[in-house]
Amino acid sequence: MKIANNWKDYKILDMAEGQKLEKWGEIILSRPDPKIIWKEKTYPKKWKEINAVYHRSKTGGGAWEFHKKMPKQWQIKYKELTFNIKPMGFKHTGLFPEQAVNWDWMMEKIQKSKRKEIKVLNLFAYTGGATVACLAAGASVCHVDSSKGMTTWAKENVVSSGLEKRPVRFIIDDVVKFVNREIRRGNKYDAIIMDPPSYGRGAKGEVWQFEENIYDLVELCTNVLSDNPLFFLINSYTTGISSKVLEDILKLTVNKKAKGTVTSGEVGLPMENSELVLPCGIYGRWEK
């Protein structure tokens, strides 16, 4: 498991009864996580310091309950990267801190490559954590997401990190349609990142289902890889999918186009002052 243990502005303070107690900068939030199936709190007193807690509804969805006054939006830093945080519907804050392990990896790959130009394609790019990381490392990025709101948020993160003059394109579109257009245009990328949802809809209502569509998308993306690709990353939070499946998909697709090293595993977040680690999804990586 790759553990995101280089954070200073984000911490898991405790975990119990299906909730994780997190510190985002100076703000303390309690959010649900189905993997926390134990009941015992390690630090009961810390739960009294909560700014807001997200309650899941039995009928789906849920709502935030605010205990203390807090800003609607604030910032946290990861190394030289700055992200805008705001609690929104369905428990999210606009950032997945466990992805820091992938940001570190891709930044190192880009910087150590010593190439003059590296073009990155970031699919299902959300609020742009990977976009910001790759721009900071010196790459150019094409950021694709079907949500206008998330894309605006990603632009804010780029500006907050002082990277607005770096070469970045923001595309609001269905990922599959966009990749097909790039194939027709003959555009190529040295690195591809994708963080597909379990289920989602494109900009015009196109349906995405992970199990049904992931293999075809990865295979499609091999047509926009350059002749000398640097890396290919798949992230997934889809329940019931093993990381080995992502590894196998990369071996059957990307590794046939360009021989490299394929690895996979889990990503996790450590709890402060504890040996506990919260599993937070899986990854598959192809790299030169």
Where are these regions (language model features)?
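Non-catalytic substrate-recognition/targeting regions of SAM-dependent transferases
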Residues: 7-22, 29-97, 104
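Conserved class I S-adenosyl-L-methionine
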Residues: 116-126
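Conserved SAM-binding loop of SAM-dependent methyltransferases across substrates and taxa
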Residues: 127-139
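Conserved SAM-binding motif I beta-strand of class I
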Residues: 140-145
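S-adenosyl-L-methionine
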Residues: 147-193
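S-adenosylmethionine
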Residues: 175-255
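C-terminal catalytic and target-recognition region of SAM-dependent MTase-like enzymes
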Residues: 229-288
